[in-house]
Structures are given as structure tokens and as C-alpha cells.
Swiss-Prot record:
Homodimer. Gene3D superfamilies: FAD/NAD(P)-binding domain. Its cofactor is FAD. GO terms for molecular function: ferredoxin-NADP+ reductase activity; flavin adenine dinucleotide binding; NADP binding. This is Ferredoxin--NADP reductase. Belongs to the ferredoxin--NADP reductase type 2 family. It catalyses: 2 reduced [2Fe-2S]-[ferredoxin] + NADP(+) + H(+) = 2 oxidized [2Fe-2S]-[ferredoxin] + NADPH. Its EC number is 1.18.1.2.
Length: 342
């Protein structure tokens, strides 16, 4: 018989918003478990851009996705959350008012008072470039994300795409690459203007080879790339030497089982009350990129704000008879004791 795990709050998603929600809930003596489909904490920060700089976290001029994840994990240590990784929530059943029985694809069963959906954009899959045989090189020399920059040191790197990700990694990897080629289908880039300007400066200085066209063929053996053929826009072809390829064609987002949980949806996002970030189902909240409301900004700092307000409503479900007094960590000896700093 499967053992039922009982917790005050179950958080679906262990990205930055889910992690910070643990902190805000912990200050209110609310215990949390987290479930994430990934095999690591950090969400998109850990999976897609662990070494990419983030510049808009308040008070931190620059931090990488990995660095932010590590800092959040350190911050929530006092509250000892339990993580259930490589699992996906498949079913949510209402058993109380509020109260939910939640089942994962691994057969794990939770009973929680409050359910928090912090699943980002749902599950995300990189769009595969339309190049015959590309799948034979995936995971060895074709990569859809940069997890360790050092893995690309001294390599002949081919980057394909014209958006922010393609430009950012062109700029970040260029100093450690043996050679670098950027291929885009047109000489018009969708990335930030300052990134486009920096990229063109690299081209002018001979540090980057820019090809305007499309990849038509890959060469290599046993999963290892040795080169690629580009059909240029003037109908000529160009041969590129490369042993690592990074295609950035965007992501396909899939909401997954969340769509079957009885929640109102709007363009695959969950509408919420902006005072509490509660959904149409009492006791189920949505924070981070998964939710929508007028003026919504898909920023990590917005998700932190949403998690703080969510916790203030969630605690009333967990402790309906308890009078909750708002406290500041700067002055409350009670909160400081919980954090282990007093």
C-alpha cells in the first residue's frame, strides 16, 4: 500500500518562485514539500541558463541561474523542505475545504491543505532545427542549453538563431572558443539592440564569423560533429568547421496535466486574484510564469512578490484559528530565531 505523505503545502515546481515560497511560508510556520519534473532544483534557471548572467534581481547586480538557485537553497535551509524530483503531478482531487489529494506519475500520494502551482510555463522542450539527422548528435555535440561554459572551451562553436539566447551565448562563449560562427536566416536580429551591436563588433574584429542563411546538412561520426553546410541567402553554400552546435530556435511550452485540475485557464495560463494569487479553486494558488493577471510581468522578482502575498493567505487555511501578526525579519526576534540568526 502506498504511504500517504501529509504536508501543510505542496508546491508544484522547484524553480526560484517555488523556492522563495518555501521561505515565506516557513516564516509563518507552514511546512512544505515540493515536486518538480526536473532532476534538479532551480527550474529554468538550472535547466536552461545555469551560467547565464541575470541582472534584474533586486540588490544583486549580477548572478547566474546556478548562483541564484544556490542562494535560495541556502536561504530556505532553516525550514527543511522536502523535494521530490523527477516526478510530475498527474492528479489533483479535492478532499477538504480546502484540502487536496495529489498523485504523481511515480505513484506517490500527498495530502495537503494548500496546493501552490509554481510550474513556470509548464514543461518546456527546445524546438529542434529542421536539419536532417540532427538527433544523432543531440547530447554529444548538439546542445540546446549551456550548463557548463567550460565544456565549450577551445571548441569550434556553431550557434544558430537570431534571438536573445543565440546572441547572449555568442557573446559569453566567444572569449573561450577556438572559433565561432553565428548563423541566422536573415541579417535582422530579434535580440536586445546592445547585444546586436556587440555581436557586430566581434564580426568587425574578426572574432566571429557571421553567416546569413540556413543550415542544410551536418557532418560527423558517432555523434560527434565535424562540420556543417550552410545555404547562404545568395544561393551559394559555405562549409563550416565545428565540433559543437548550439541551436536556439525557442521553446515549446506544454502545460501538461495542470490543464486537467479544474482550474480556469486563459491562453494556457492560470488567472489569479492579485491580492492573494489564489485561483478559482479555493486553496489552490498560482505564482510565477504560470499565472496571469492585468499588468503581469514575467520576472523572477514578480514571482517573489507573488509568493509573499500567497503565503499570507495560505497560512489562514493551514491555521484557520490562529491570529497571524505580520512581522519584519529585521526586528522580530521570533523570525530571527526561526532563521537561526538569534
Amino acid at each position: 500500500m502506498t504511504e500517504t505523505i501529509k504536508t501543510d503545502v505542496l508546491i508544484v515546481g522547484a524553480g526560484p518562485c517555488g523556492l522563495f515560497a518555501v521561505f515565506e511560508l516557513g516564516l509563518l510556520d507552514v511546512k512544505a514539500h515540493l515536486v518538480d519534473i526536473l532532476d534538479k532544483v532551480g527550474g529554468q534557471c538550472a535547466e536552461l541558463y545555469p551560467e547565464k548572467p541575470i541582472y534584474d534581481i533586486p540588490g544583486i547586480p549580477m548572478v547566474t541561474g546556478h548562483g541564484l538557485t544556490e542562494a535560495l537553497m541556502e536561504q530556505i535551509k532553516p525550514f527543511n523542505p522536502t523535494f521530490h524530483l523527477s516526478e510530475m503531478v498527474e492528479n489533483v482531487e479535492k478532499i477538504g475545504d480546502p484540502g487536496f489529494r495529489v498523485t504523481t506519475n511515480a505513484g506517490k500520494v500527498f495530502e495537503c491543505t494548500v496546493l501552490v502551482v509554481a510550474a513556470g510555463g509548464g514543461s518546456f522542450l527546445p524546438k529542434r532545427p529542421p536539419v536532417p539527422g540532427v538527433e544523432a548528435y543531440e547530447g554529444t555535440s548538439v546542445h540546446y542549453a549551456v550548463r557548463k561554459m567550460e565544456d565549450f572551451r577551445g571548441k569550434d562553436i556553431l550557434i544558430v538563431g537570431g534571438g536573445d539566447s543565440a546572441l547572449d551565448w555568442t557573446l559569453n562563449l566567444n572569449p573561450i572558443a577556438k572559433s565561432m560562427t553565428l548563423v541566422h536566416r536573415r541579417d535582422d536580429f530579434r535580440g536586445a539592440p546592445h547585444s546586436v551591436e556587440q555581436m557586430r563588433q566581434l564580426v568587425a574584429s574578426g572574432k566571429l564569423d557571421l553567416k546569413i542563411g540556413q543550415i542544410t546538412e551536418l557532418q560527423g561520426d558517432n555523434g560527434q560533429l565535424t562540420g556543417a553546410t550552410v545555404k547562404l541567402n545568395d544561393n551559394t553554400t559555405s562549409q563550416i568547421k565545428c565540433d559543437a552546435m548550439l541551436p536556439f530556435f525557442g521553446l515549446t511550452m506544454k502545460l501538461g496535466p495542470v490543464a486537467n485540475w479544474g482550474l480556469d485557464l486563459e491562453n494556457n495560463l492560470i488567472p489569479v486574484d492579485t491580492g492573494t494569487f489564489e485561483t478559482n479553486v479555493p486553496g489552490i494558488f498560482a505564482i510565477g510564469d504560470i499565472n496571469t493577471y492585468p499588468g503581469k510581468l514575467k520576472l523572477i522578482l514578480s514571482g517573489f512578490h507573488e509568493g509573499a502575498l500567497m503565503a499570507q493567505k495560505a497560512v489562514k487555511y493551514v491555521y484557520p484559528d490562529k491570529r497571524v501578526v505580520f512581522q519584519y525579519t529585521t526586528s522580530s526576534t521570533n523570525l530571527q530565531k526561526k532563521l537561526g540568526v538569534n
